[in-house]
């Protein structure tokens, strides 16, 4: 099908991208626009504990399911950072948004950075990176000695391809950290299992091989990195701290005792941090 401009579709809560992929979105509240970008294999449901309270505080909270995730369509293509950045532009354009605060969790750190590289900051006022997991560069190379060996990534890929449900079960407990009941884990697992197998594998692959270091250095909008010091999915010293070091003027706030899913376990603190980033009140 020929590419067309992105538009709001007749279906409720639906945006059609330039390549006619259907994206489900939710749009709560009025005021300062925040666009929430979900983690790997998660969807817009993950942001409930940010969107609901912030939408009552003069914030317009928007989140969408990435292609191949949740209620969005699975086109069988486009599971790369360029296309995901294009999808984000489709959302911002269709909703005619400007002055946006991007809130990017985990792999979405790469989406946010690539968006700024491809489209600039005309629509974006600032970016909050929540437990970034795609930046700066995960793979160990001669000029990235602190990265992870390619052989370990290949082991992980094989485990994902053999049985994604078993991989999730083996890695679920550290995600939120100690003191969390089984119910939130089951909630996250249900989201993950709504992701297409192809999208899951392709995004896991591109996340590990994409080098964002040069792109991070070119970011000009105010940037905040929030990261837990017990993040087993994306360790602080591998991702969050070097991401902050590469973005000019970025701020890094470390959440003590927090894992990768602190949007749930530390929701109130995160919400206060986002409000402070907007200039609303001290965190």
Give the residues covered by each predicted segment.
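Catalytic active-site module of serine/aspartate enzymes centered on a nucleophile-bearing elbow/loop
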Residues: 249-283
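Conserved acidic catalytic loop of the alpha/beta-hydrolase fold
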Residues: 83-100
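Conserved HGGG/HGGXW glycine-rich cap/lid loop of the alpha/beta-hydrolase fold
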Residues: 17-77
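Conserved loop-alpha-helix segment in the C-terminal half of the alpha/beta-hydrolase fold
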Residues: 218-258
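Flexible "cap/lid" loop of the alpha/beta hydrolase fold
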Residues: 113-159
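Gly/Ala-rich beta-loop-alpha elbow adjacent to hydrolase catalytic centers
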Residues: 104, 108, 112
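Conserved alpha/beta-hydrolase catalytic His-Asp/Glu region
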Residues: 138-148, 158-217
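Alpha/beta-hydrolase fold catalytic core
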Residues: 1-35, 56-59, 97-98, 125, ...
């Amino acid at each position: 099908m020929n590419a067309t401009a992105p538009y709001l579709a007749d279906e409720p809560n639906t945006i059609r991208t330039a390549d006619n992929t259907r994206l489900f979105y939710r749009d709560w509240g009025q005021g300062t626009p925040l666009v929430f970008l979900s983690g790997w294999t998660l969807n817009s449901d993950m942001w409930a504990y940010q969107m609901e309270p912030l939408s009552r505080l003069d914030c317009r909270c928007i989140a969408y399911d990435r292609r191949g995730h949740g209620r969005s369509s699975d086109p069988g293509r486009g599971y790369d950072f360029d296309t995901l950045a294009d999808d984000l532009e489709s959302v911002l354009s269709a909703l005619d948004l400007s002055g946006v605060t991007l809130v990017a969790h985990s792999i979405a750190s790469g989406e946010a950075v690539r968006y700024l590289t491809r489209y600039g900051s005309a629509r974006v006022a600032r970016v909050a990176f929540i437990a970034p997991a795609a930046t700066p560069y995960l793979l160990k190379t001669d000029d990235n000695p602190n990265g992870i060996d390619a052989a370990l990534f290949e082991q992980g890929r094989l485990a994902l391809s053999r049985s994604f449900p078993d991989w999730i079960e083996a890695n679920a407990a550290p995600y939120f950290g100690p003191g969390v009941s089984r119910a939130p884990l089951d909630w996250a697992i249900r989201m993950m299992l709504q992701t297409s197998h192809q999208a899951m594998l392709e995004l896991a692959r591109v996340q590990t091989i994409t080098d964002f270091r040069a792109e991070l250095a070119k970011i000009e909008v105010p940037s905040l990195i929030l990261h837990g010091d017990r993040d087993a999915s994306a360790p602080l010293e591998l991702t969050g701290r070097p991401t902050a070091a590469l973005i000019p003027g970025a701020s890094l706030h470390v959440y003590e005792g927090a894992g990768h899913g602190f949007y749930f376990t530390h929701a109130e603190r995160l919400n206060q941090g986002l409000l402070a980033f907007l200039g609303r009140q001290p965190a």
